[in-house]
Amino acid sequence: MSNPTDNNSATSSITPNFSAFSSFTTYKPSDSFSSFESDSSPSKSSSSRKNRDKIADKKQRRNRTTFTTFQLHALEAAFDKTHYPDVYARETLAAKVQLPEVRVQVWFQNRRAKFRRQEKQDCQGEEKHSLKDTMPSWSWMSENKTDTPPMLPPANTLSSTHNNGISDEFFKTSEGKEVYGFPFAEYGTPADNTHVSKTGNVFHLNFEDSDKKSMKKESPQTPSTSSPFISEYHPPFIPYYIPNQSFSNAFNQYPMPFPYPIHFEPPQLTHSQENC
């Protein structure tokens, strides 16, 4: 049998020691950690950002050079001579105006850009001015505008120039008689036997009774087309003298002149007319 004292010692060794775990269960922040939290406050972070922004602004900021009147005159005179000076010319000019050669080079770059802008604006202004000059002005329409319509010529008068471009002088001979573009010297003038009525731009012929004159003369032949008044676009038309009124009435239904020559054969004379 075992001793009860041994059993008590075994049970005491098996039971865990909770005092060793008490230090892990209780959490207390250390002084160093609390100081780190205090350093990372929002106010300090914003101030650090402002400092960084100031440093960046100083890096991006360029030093602008102020030129005196003497320096500007010397630079402009050199620019008038050449827009692209070489290194030796820039160094000589920089020593003259007491500026670094880099500043002189930058000034020439800016001056060339300004010159190109001015040249482009001048070209655009000239183009607009030329367009205004070439465009027609419509002011005369407003000045000459009237409420009353223009007066039309009467129907019984004929304008000086017809629609086909032939003037009144074309239908007149040297004696002032109206003909149809060819001489009637050997056949007689139709103005003696006919009556021409002008309505607008169309001619109508009203033949009178010319039985006696037509019987005395034979049927005329077509005249030669060598007359300067006859053109290939307006073929001649020679009206034959028609003694009967029936033919003349039928002839009056068509406007004159015809686009092609029309020939009418005279009617056969009866024995009663021949005996007369």
Swiss-Prot record:
Whether Transferase counts among this entry's keywords is no
- Compositional bias per record (Polar residues), positions renumbered to this chain: 220-229
Task: Tell me what organism the protein belongs to.
Answer: Caenorhabditis elegans
An example of a GO molecular function for this protein is: DNA-binding transcription factor activity
Kindly name one Pfam family recorded for this protein: Homeodomain
Protein known as: Homeobox protein ceh-8
Q: Which PANTHER family match?
A: HOMEOBOX PROTEIN, PUTATIVE-RELATED
DNA-binding region location: 60-119
Keywords, comma-separated and alphabetical: Developmental protein, DNA-binding, Homeobox, Nucleus
Where does the UniProt annotation place the signal sequence? Answer: none
Q: What does this protein do?
A: Required for cell specification of the RIA interneurons.
Gene name in the database record: ceh-8
Q: Where is the composition biased (Low complexity)?
A: 28-46
Basic and acidic residues composition bias: residue spans: 209-219
Report whether DNA-binding shows up as a keyword of the record: yes
Chief site of localization: nucleus
> Region Disordered: what ranges?
28-62, 209-230
Classify the source by domain of life: Eukaryota
Q: Can you say where in the cell this protein is located?
A: Nucleus
| CDD domains assigned | homeodomain
Q: What is an annotated GO biological process for this record, any one?
A: regulation of transcription by RNA polymerase II
